[in-house]
Amino acid sequence: GNKKCRIYAVCGVSQTPKIRNIERGIMSKGNMEIRKSTREDIKQIMAIFTTAKEYMAAHGNKTQWGDGYPGEEILKTDIDAGNSYVIVNNGMIVGTFSFIIGEEPTYQVIKNGKWTDDRLYGTIHRLASSGIVKGIARACFEYCIKQIDYIRIDTHKDNISMQTAIERFGFHKCGNIYVKGGAERIAYDYIS
């Protein structure tokens, strides 16, 4: 993989009562466009996941996306549910994420803190960049906050790149949550 790439892997961003028109599904930012993923995008998205895993491993985060996660089956499930998105720059897929409005089961229990609000939220998962262009995380966050005004997200304690992107955008650190299997994640939320 490209050693200069900046890859972000994200688990969990949540939603708010002000749900905006997510069905349109396309937002442009400069040369970047965000659209819903299709099954035709799977090969490119899986390549981005591979690049993200390589980046994370090379930067001290060897365990966040282990054991084949995220795999093609979860990606197909996201696509079929309308929750998978790609970020396209000049016709090329340069990033991907999952965005789900509604309750995230792993967010029901939070330790060492609390959520800012208990209203409806959107959750960002599986955010990854090809490393070809900068600003993928910011583009994702800006898109999601236009869909609903309350977002939640979580990341691994070793994913310093993602923590930096989350905090730079203005997310508030809320505490710790535990994903399926019991692994701890740092939990954040953002209200626009």
Model segments located where?
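Conserved beta-strand in the GNAT
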Residues: 86, 92-102
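A short beta-loop-alpha structural element at the N-terminal edge
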Residues: 33-47
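Conserved GNAT-fold acetyl-CoA-binding loop/helix
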Residues: 53-73
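Conserved acyl-donor/pantetheine-binding loop and adjacent beta-alpha core of acyl/acetyltransferases
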Residues: 98-132
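Conserved GNAT acetyl-CoA-binding A-motif
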Residues: 147-158
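Conserved acetyl-CoA-binding loop-helix of GNAT-fold acetyltransferases
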Residues: 132-146, 164-168
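A short helix-loop-beta-strand connector motif used in the catalytic cores of GNAT acetyltransferases and
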Residues: 73-86, 103-105
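Conserved active-site alpha-helix within GNAT-family acetyltransferase domains
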Residues: 158-175, 183
